[in-house]
């Protein structure tokens, strides 16, 4: 059923006598894949040439990584990196193919030609190409790119000023703008439905599990992960390894069993003591503080506020800052619909499925002011102001503040139950 396997079967590539052999390993290269058992970078440095013929990449850091390791590469004009390279008069070590929506056959032929040309180079020329690739990668060092970043940021501010000055209540939209405000008012004669969600409280002896579940420290510490899985391996997998959802699904009988399980309680106490010791360490007050902004953070699959590798990279920065005890504060966006789930149809076509996140099952909590009010921030946009509530996500010692522009939520305590009352605003503005 795999389209790559189908394309190879029956082609000259499947001929044992062919000089070209394909090793197709659709696996994450984490040194435990069962085929190579080496990390991506260990394999990368052993390559003669890498191919990244992207159909779309805002930047595409894989070919840049390749030349940083002095491995020549092939990319396309549909990758930001490819466009950046192609603007240079000379770029030895990087071949850039012109790719468009309808020229797949042309790109395939050009890709084959690029591989053939490289294979015909003598050893001296290959070594020259490798050195040139390494030198070219230095052009992308942050020390060089930061000046261009400042220019781009200044240009964005200038353009924002133009829009702010143009937009008024009776202003005519710019020709290139298509802004439509749709107001929806609730009818007073119709019933208003509100959602109620019940949160369970764990027995006192097991309360540390709740604290661990609400700090993502657990997701990169094997002892904490194993602790949750030990409780009920099948349920842990069914809850998609989300400890908050997992604890909500535990039966009262299982909780009582855990309260009497001395071996489990000893493991819980050990992990909790490790966590408290970790959290008690504070950064040096004299250390410069860092504010980190990103559109996405890949911290764990249960918190769907990322879509790819750059989000994972941003998430790793937060975890590393926590481990290094760097005083960093991160700011991002809380998406109701995170990354989509990919499925394949019977014909092999990719289908995207979007699932709404249940915020009550996420390791986030409202940020409140000294009066107990939910903290909100106002962001000035052309012709309007956007209000967003602030949530806090604890990533070890690092605080991640997530902005959420949806309706208001009110927490109500009734006995041992925590009820979350969600009230939608009576009037909304939609932009399409």
Predicted regions: what they are:
Residues 179-282:
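Extended, charge-enriched "interface" segments that sit outside catalytic cores
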Residues 420-431:
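Residue-level detector of conserved catalytic or cofactor/ligand-binding positions
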Residues 55:
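Aromatic "clamp/platform" in nucleotide-sugar-dependent glycosyltransferases that forms part
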Residues 72-76, 82:
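Short hydrophobic beta-strand element within catalytic cores of glycosyltransferases
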Residues 98-196:
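C-terminal amphipathic helix plus adjacent low-complexity
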Residues 1-42:
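Nucleotide-activated donor-binding/catalytic signature segment of Leloir-type glycosyltransferases, i.e.
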Residues 60-63:
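Short glycine/serine-rich donor-binding loops of glycosyltransferases
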């Amino acid at each position: 059923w795999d389209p790559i396997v189908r394309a190879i079967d029956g082609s000259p590539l499947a001929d044992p006598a062919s000089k070209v052999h394909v090793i197709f390993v659709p696996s994450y290269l984490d040194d435990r894949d069962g085929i190579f058992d080496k990390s991506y970078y260990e394999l990368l440095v052993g390559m003669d040439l890498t191919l990244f013929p992207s159909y779309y990449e805002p930047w595409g850091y894989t070919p840049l990584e390749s030349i940083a390791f002095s491995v020549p590469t092939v990319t396309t004009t549909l990758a930001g990196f490819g466009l950046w390279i192609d603007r240079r008069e000379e770029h030895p070590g990087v071949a850039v193919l012109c790719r468009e929506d309808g020229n797949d056959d042309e790109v395939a032929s050009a890709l084959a030609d690029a591989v053939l040309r490289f294979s015909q180079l003598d050893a001296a020329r290959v070594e020259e190409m490798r050195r040139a690739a390494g030198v070219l990668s230095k052009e992308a060092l942050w020390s060089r790119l930061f000046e261009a970043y400042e220019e781009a940021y200044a240009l964005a501010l200038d353009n924002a000023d133009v829009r702010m000055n143009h937009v008024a209540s009776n202003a005519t939209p710019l020709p290139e703008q298509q802004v439509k405000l749709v107001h929806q008012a609730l009818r007073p004669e119709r019933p208003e439905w509100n959602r109620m969600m019940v949160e369970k409280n764990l027995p006192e002896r097991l309360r540390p599990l709740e604290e661990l579940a609400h700090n993502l420290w657990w997701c990169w510490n094997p002892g904490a992960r194993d602790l949750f899985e030990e409780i009920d391996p099948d349920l842990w997998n069914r809850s998609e390894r989300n400890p908050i959802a997992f604890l909500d699904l535990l039966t009262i009988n299982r909780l009582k069993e855990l309260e009497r399980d001395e071996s489990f309680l000893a493991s819980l106490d050990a992990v909790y003591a490790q966590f408290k010791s970790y959290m008690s360490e504070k950064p040096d007050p004299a250390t410069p503080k860092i504010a980190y902004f990103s559109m996405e953070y890949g911290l764990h699959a249960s918190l769907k506020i990322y879509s790819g590798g750059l989000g994972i990279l941003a998430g790793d920065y937060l975890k590393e800052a926590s481990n290094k005890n760097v005083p960093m504060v991160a700011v991002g966006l809380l998406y109701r619909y995170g990354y989509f789930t990919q499925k394949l149809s019977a014909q092999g076509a990719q289908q995207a499925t979007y699932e709404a996140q249940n915020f009550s099952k996420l390791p986030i909590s409202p940020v409140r002011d000294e009066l107990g009010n939910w903290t909100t921030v106002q962001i000035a946009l052309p012709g309007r102001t956007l209000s967003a509530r602030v949530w806090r996500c604890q990533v070890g010692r690092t605080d991640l503040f997530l902005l959420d522009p949806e309706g208001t939520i009110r927490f109500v305590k009734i006995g041992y139950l925590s009820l979350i009352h969600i009230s939608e605003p009576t009037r909304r503005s939609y932009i399409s």
